[in-house]
């Protein structure tokens, strides 16, 4: 990562702190107050020791100084607790703020873009990388301000008593941040590499975990285990590189801090021996002055040392922000959102004229498409993998941008309220998502107002009633659909879609996981449903499309044939697909 990129990422991170500006100011004010209390405590302690050792003052007269010292400890403890709490709240608010920005962007670009990355990579961005921003806001930014304020407060307190001690502080102070920067130059690069390695490890591990059954069937578990081990070793090495820099930085900071404090101790030692006679403004050097300056000396460097420690939080934050900013600022093409709703007083009718579906990067996914889907028609979309069928369905859902014209009931889709449009769509995909919860809770995602009779009707039509009667509607489905078979999950998804009563039914291989008998029964239910709504179905089982009102045949991103089954079965690319399908069945 070059320096310009690092500067830009740090500028971006600072620009995100608008929601927590008040908390940040409160943190700095409390820390400044704590530094004044520290100076007062040091005054009480130095005065107490001077009076006790040099002036032999009765102990009764020292009680106010003891009380001042104790009250100071109590106040600083309360301030420290308040600062820790404010810092945590700041980091938490910023994490939530940035996560919301990521979620908003994900919602904007849609699933067609999200599927371009493994789920593990998204999980890493949303969880680990956003978490790594916490200390940047909770610790580094407040400490950066304090490292300028607290030393100035202490310098102002020390310099009027002894200008030589103040001069030592002033000369040695820049050494700490200087060497901190020198040592930490590579920290951001190492942190960014560490985040990239973690993202790859997360993606690999989650994908292999999900495909464990397939790996076992093909006897590839040992090979993939080795890949995971290699990725884990890479992550260990990058983590150790970050830790090496952290320990080296700490050692360098401690060294220069110790040297600086030692210089002041040597100065006062020789001054008390009478070897040095400057720095006191021609006044005698008292024990109070020596104690006061030496007690404050470590506190003078402490904010700078803390900044050095938290400097690695800055590096970690910049490294984590790289992938986040890259996603948030990527120039994805999206369908423009409008407030105009589509009139659905009549059934859905779709028409396309020179429609070219675009990816979010702007490349064409299809050639110009021209078609008409009349209201209440059951239309099948067939073709080989990669022909553009799913892209066409995604553009109808409003997940992909397009050129040309795509009208729903005569209204251009790009000029419509997409959120409202999707409320009128029922959709079943190849791998339907069932959430962790009961069967009934998953069905009610289709229509939260549905009663038991409507649920039973949908289950019967989707051929799911058979197993739901045995399991019960309150049967618990685990994460990822565990607890039911793939075919059962498919039928529940179809029941959910039928329950939704959408004006448009979109089906992507709805019978892919069903046996022949269930498939025929479900197709009958879908054919019945299509009498009351417009239906567009993607399928490879083209031998079962005799009931469809119309078939669109796609090849290499264009519709090469349109018509009914009887019109297409003996000619063109559809006849080839049908012959190939029948050969596969045999």
From Swiss-Prot:
Entry keywords, A to Z: Amino-acid transport, ATP-binding, Cell inner membrane, Cell membrane, Membrane, Nucleotide-binding, Translocase, Transmembrane, Transmembrane helix, Transport
Enzyme's top EC category: translocase
GO molecular function, one term: ABC-type transporter activity
Membrane topology: Multi-pass membrane protein
Record's subcellular location: Cell inner membrane
InterPro entries for the chain: AAA+_ATPase, ABC1_TM_dom, ABC1_TM_sf, ABC_transporter-like_ATP-bd, ABC_transporter-like_CS, ABC_transptr_CydD, P-loop_NTPase, Type_1_exporter
Binding positions for ATP per the UniProt entry: 383-390
Domain ABC transporter per the UniProt entry, residue ranges: 350-581
Reactions mediated catalytically: L-cysteine(in) + ATP + H2O = L-cysteine(out) + ADP + phosphate + H(+); glutathione(in) + ATP + H2O = glutathione(out) + ADP + phosphate + H(+)
Role played: Part of the ABC transporter complex CydDC that exports the reduced low-molecular-weight thiols cysteine and glutathione to the periplasm. Export of these thiol-containing redox-active molecules may be crucial for redox homeostasis in the periplasm, permitting correct assembly of various respiratory complexes and formation of correct disulfide bonds in periplasmic and secreted proteins. CydD contains transmembrane domains (TMD), which form a pore in the inner membrane, and an ATP-binding domain (NBD), which is responsible for energy generation.
Family of the protein in this entry: Belongs to the ABC transporter superfamily. Cysteine exporter (TC 3.A.1.129.1) family.
Protein name: Glutathione/L-cysteine transport system ATP-binding/permease protein CydD
Gene: cydD
């Amino acid at each position: 990562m070059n320096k310009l990129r690092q500067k830009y990422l740090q500028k971006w991170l600072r620009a995100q702190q608008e929601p927590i500006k008040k908390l940040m100011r409160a943190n700095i004010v409390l820390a400044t107050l704590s530094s004044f209390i520290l100076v007062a405590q040091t005054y009480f302690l130095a005065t107490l020791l001077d009076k006790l050792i040099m002036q032999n003052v009765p102990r009764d007269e020292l009680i106010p100084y003891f009380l001042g010292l104790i009250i100071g400890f109590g106040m600083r403890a309360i301030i420290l607790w308040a600062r820790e709490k404010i810092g945590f709240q700041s980091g938490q608010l910023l994490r939530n703020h940035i996560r919301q920005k990521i979620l908003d962007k994900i919602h904007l670009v849609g699933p067609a873009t999200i599927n371009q990355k493994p789920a593990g990579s998204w999980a890493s961005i949303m969880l680990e990388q956003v978490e790594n921003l916490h200390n940047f806001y909770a610790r580094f930014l407040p400490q950066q301000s304090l490292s300028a304020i607290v030393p100035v407060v202490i310098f102002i307190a020390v310099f009027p008593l002894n200008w030589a001690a103040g001069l030592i502080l002033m000369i040695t102070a820049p050494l700490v941040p200087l060497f901190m920067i020198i040592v930490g130059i590579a920290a951001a690069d190492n942190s960014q590499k560490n985040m990239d390695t973690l993202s790859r490890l997360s993606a690999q591990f989650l994908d292999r975990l999900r495909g464990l059954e397939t790996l076992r069937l093909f006897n590839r578990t040992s090979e993939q285990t080795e890949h995971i081990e290699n990725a884990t070793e890479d992550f260990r090495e990058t983590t150790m590189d970050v830790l090496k820099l952290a320990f080296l930085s700490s050692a360098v900071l401690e060294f220069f801090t110790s040297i600086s404090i030692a210089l002041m101790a040597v100065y006062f030692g020789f001054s008390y021996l009478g070897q040095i006679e400057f720095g006191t403004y021609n006044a005698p050097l008292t024990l109070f002055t020596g104690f006061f300056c030496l007690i404050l000396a470590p506190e003078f460097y402490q904010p700078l040392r803390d900044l050095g420690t938290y400097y690695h939080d800055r590096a970690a934050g910049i490294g984590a922000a790289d992938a986040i900013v890259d996603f948030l600022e990527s120039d994805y093409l999206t369908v423009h959102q409008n407030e105009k709703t589509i009139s659905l007083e009549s059934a859905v009718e779709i028409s396309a004229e020179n429609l070219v579906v675009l990816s979010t990067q702007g490349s064409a996914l299809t050639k110009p498409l021209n078609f008409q889907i009349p209201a209440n028609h059951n239309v099948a979309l067939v073709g080989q993998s990669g022909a553009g069928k799913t892209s066409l369905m995604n553009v109808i859902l409003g997940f992909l941008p397009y050129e040309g014209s795509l009208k729903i009931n005569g209204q251009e889709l790009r000029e419509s309220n997409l959120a409202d449009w999707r409320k009128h769509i029922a959709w079943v995909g190849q791998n339907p998502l069932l959430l962790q919860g009961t069967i009934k809770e998953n069905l009610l995602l289709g229509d939260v107002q549905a009663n038991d009779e409507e649920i039973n009707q949908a289950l019967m039509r989707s051929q799911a009633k058979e197993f739901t009667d045995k399991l019960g509607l309150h049967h618990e489905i685990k994460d990822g659909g565990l607890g039911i078979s793939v075919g059962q999950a498919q039928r529940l998804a179809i029941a959910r879609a039928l329950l939704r009563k959408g004006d448009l039914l979109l089906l992507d291989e709805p019978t892919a996981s069903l046996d022949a008998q269930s498939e025929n029964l479900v197709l009958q239910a879908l054919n019945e449903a299509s009498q009351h709504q417009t239906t567009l179905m993607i399928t490879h089982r083209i031998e079962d499309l005799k009931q469809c009102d119309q078939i669109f045949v796609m090849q290499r991103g264009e519709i090469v044939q349109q018509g009914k089954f009887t019109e297409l079965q003996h000619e063109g690319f559809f006849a080839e697909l049908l012959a190939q399908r029948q050969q596969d069945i045999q």
